């Protein structure tokens, strides 16, 4: 019998109510604006806003206008490529998560890494990446592979935990493990967004969760650090913060402004 590793995390103090409140914020947005009236242009705009926010969190200096004109730097261009396939990749995430994550890296790092490094999970013979400022050192390759494999297996199993909780854990694990040579932050945030789509939180991708994380950027690295080193207290705090980011992401939807 498989173990539901996500359900106990959803039961940490305050997490269930925070996840419900964030889900309500998204539901209200979709209900008030009319889910059936959401066009592809609104999805494209939301994804573009998310790409800019995610790239900015990774250190991009490109402006929203440069992103729109296709004149952005490598980080922002990679984030835009991610958005181009996010909706197609989302349905595959529960069946083949590792393949989705490696594809996300291929897209994100096309301008940042050599071709043979695209979609490549690091080994013990390679340097440990340090591409998310403010985090403690990433674990060695053996621990990374063990945890990433466990995460992938758990994603394919049924869970009673809210999709928001699962998405936040996936985001944090990829960011903390840094399984790729580069662009791990972009991949982590895109993986979270994919799950929010796949688990039906925002099936038409008109919210901007990356924008929510950007609004809360002052606590982004510290939140991930606490997740990595503070045990269940750090996990709880990260989950609460992620629920707040999703709520703010709903407020940043092009359906609002």
Residue positions per predicted region:
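FIC/Doc superfamily catalytic core
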Residues: 1-257
């Amino acid at each position: 019998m498989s173990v539901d590793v996500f359900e106990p995390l959803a039961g940490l103090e305050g997490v269930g109510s925070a996840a419900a409140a964030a889900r309500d914020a998204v539901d209200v947005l979709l209900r008030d604006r009319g889910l059936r009236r959401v066009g592809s242009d609104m999805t494209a705009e939301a994804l573009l806003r998310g790409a800019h926010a995610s790239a900015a969190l990774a250190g991009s200096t490109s402006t929203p206008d440069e992103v729109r004109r296709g004149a952005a730097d490598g980080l922002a261009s990679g984030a835009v490529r991610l958005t181009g396939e996010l909706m197609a990749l989302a349905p595959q995430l529960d069946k083949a998560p590792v393949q989705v994550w490696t594809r996300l890296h291929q897209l994100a790092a096309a301008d940042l890494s050599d071709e043979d490094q695209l979609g490549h999970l690091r080994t013990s013979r390679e340097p440990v990446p340090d591409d998310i400022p403010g985090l403690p050192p990433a674990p060695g390759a053996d621990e990374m592979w063990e945890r990433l494999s466990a995460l992938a297996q758990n994603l394919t199993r049924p869970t009673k935990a809210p999709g928001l909780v699962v998405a936040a854990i996936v985001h944090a694990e990829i960011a903390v493990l840094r399984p790729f040579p580069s662009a791990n932050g972009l991949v982590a945030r895109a993986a979270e967004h994919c799950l929010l789509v796949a688990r039906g939180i925002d099936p038409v991708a008109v919210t901007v969760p990356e924008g929510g994380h950007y609004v809360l950027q002052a606590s982004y690295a510290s939140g991930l650090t606490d997740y990595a080193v503070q045990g269940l207290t750090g996990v709880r705090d990260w989950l609460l913060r992620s629920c707040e980011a999703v709520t703010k992401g709903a407020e940043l939807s092009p359906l609002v402004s």
